[in-house]
């Protein structure tokens, strides 16, 4: 997408560069997909190396939690139904957050350790926040828009991945 090139071109000595990827790397679209343990990790190493080459200070994060609440009995299902076309949706919203990131959460931690980079577990931080708020209150952090409230989303929007302005703060 060319976004990294814009960022790295502006990095100066002493700048902190916060590096967090994963949500789009999980997609099946070949233009975006990477695999944890191989191509995903290689990209993280590249970003760390390029940041250091410019005199910047890289900090690696794993992905924030998706707001996917399931019934307690479904909280440990082994696969993410979003990844298999044609499969049923996840069960009706429940009270327990379901991990959709799998091994993508480990890669930034592993690369940070390997390369001597600070790692911040944003998944744990946001998981605890969202789980603590619960299914109803946590919607206030994400892009849940009532129909007719915002011109860009005339029919409304229910987005469990992207934070709104309040959630991003």
Q: What are the residue ranges of the model-derived segments?
A:
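Alpha-helical cap/lid subdomain in secreted, periplasmic
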Residues: 3-169
